[in-house]
């Protein structure tokens, strides 16, 4: 099992101007901070006895046989990019709603 914890970030202005795709061609100015609230991602291999291969939990719960059936676009494309074939559960939780 892998558990990741990341502090939640608050951007006051500047939005996405701290991404290389933007600041390589434009100026970027950002004022942001983090707070003492966190976002968590838990990942684990699924045991083989489930009827599905992928369980994704965020504000919805998805249980699918194939990666292509996953509706969450970021999760689906990450698993495709990583060529992930083994059953996995990915759960997102946060200290804030």
Residue ranges, per PLM feature:
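ATP-binding N-lobe of GHMP and related small-molecule kinases
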Residues: 1-97
